[in-house]
Design a protein with these regions (language model features):
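Alpha-helical coupling/stalk and coiled-coil linker elements that connect catalytic or binding modules
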Residues: 1-282
Length: 282
């Protein structure tokens, strides 16, 4: 069994298991498989190049399952993108081999390139993707949608980011005006934005500061200016999070339109993996 299952990918391993569990009875299909194995055995160097690409590819079958169930995560879509990016090289290698080997040429012809899908994923998704997309302003998750993909999303993200820059500028300005060198403007989910002053500096607090919360070693305040800006920032952040989720779901839906074709390619890649691994034994 170890010799039979020296595949480079999880999909290849599953296909070996399927072949062994349900032996083929159709003579033409048996002969096709034998021809592929025999032809791969005659080109070990080219075969290793293809198998190396398969080793570094994503588990396309698994991603497709999650895509169809609409539970796919950002990093998995990144895996789909990486696989689509690798398809031209795989098909080119197989096509070069196929000039002398018709069974391999038949495999190469089954490798679709999905140029439209690849373009979408390249334009829409960040290069480094988080495991989860951020679902609310307090939740965990990271950036998924690439800048310049959607103008409205860019506007909201810039507004939220600009607000945070304003907060840093406010902190520096308040330190200078009050003489409180360790004054801080902070944020937490329960209380929003606030100005924090240590107990040792309370005598320097201006009259227009409104007390918000008393801590053991500090007091927290807000100003009308800070409260107004807080609403602007949080509103932009909430809208940006919602927009990013919407755009991500749109990308998922458009990827789903290619699901049947991707499934065919996933099967072809699994066959390439299995037949090339068996060819290496001969």
């Amino acid at each position: 069994l170890d010799c039979m299952d020296d595949t480079a990918s999880p999909a290849g391993a599953r296909l070996v298991e399927s072949f062994l569990a349900r032996p083929e009875r159709d003579l033409a299909e048996i002969q096709r498989r034998q021809a592929c194995v025999e032809e791969f055995s005659r080109s070990p160097r080219a075969v290793e190049e293809v198998r190396e690409t398969l080793r570094h590819g994503a588990d396309l079958e698994r991603i497709l399952g999650r895509l169809r169930n609409r539970v796919v995560r950002p990093r998995e879509l990144g895996g789909l993108r990486a696989t689509v990016r690798g398809l031209p090289a795989i098909r080119q290698s197989l096509s070069e081999l196929g000039k002398d080997f018709p069974a391999i040429q038949s495999l190469a012809s089954r490798i679709e390139l999905f140029e439209d899908l690849g373009d979408l994923l390249n334009r829409a998704l960040e290069e480094e993707l988080p495991a989860e997309i951020k679902l609310d302003v307090k939740g965990v998750g990271g950036r998924v949608i690439r800048a310049e993909y959607d103008k409205e999303f860019d506007r909201l993200r810039d507004l939220a980011g600009g607000g945070k820059r304003w907060i840093l500028e406010l902190e520096a300005g308040e330190r200078e005006k009050t003489g409180i060198s360790n004054l801080k403007v902070k944020y937490n989910g329960a209380f929003g934005y606030f100005i924090e002053v240590t107990k040792a500096n309370l005598h320097l607090v201006p009259e227009h500061y409104v007390r918000k919360q008393t801590m053991t070693n500090a007091e927290r305040y807000y100003t009308d200016e800070l409260r107004t800006k807080e609403k602007e920032i949080l509103n932009a952040e909430e809208q940006a999070v919602a927009k990013e989720q919407e755009l991500f779901e749109e990308v998922v839906q458009r990827a789903l339109e290619h699901a049947d074709g991707l499934a065919r390619v996933a099967r072809a890649l699994a066959e390439v993996d299995v037949f090339s691994s068996w060819g290496a034994i001969l």
